[in-house]
Amino acid sequence: AYELPELPYAYDA
């Protein structure tokens, strides 16, 4: 998963 500081969740691609 990619940790995105601007989003309240982790995005898994």
Curated annotation (Swiss-Prot):
It comes from the Eukaryota. Destroys superoxide anion radicals which are normally produced within the cells and which are toxic to biological systems. GO terms for molecular function: metal ion binding; superoxide dismutase activity. Binds 1 Mn(2+) or Fe(2+) ion per subunit. This is Superoxide dismutase [Mn/Fe]. It is an enzyme of class 1 (oxidoreductase). Its cofactor is Mn(2+); Fe(2+). Belongs to the iron/manganese superoxide dismutase family. Its EC number is 1.15.1.1. It catalyses: 2 superoxide + 2 H(+) = H2O2 + O2. It comes from Arthrobotrys dactyloides. Keywords: Antioxidant, Iron, Manganese, Metal-binding, Oxidoreductase.
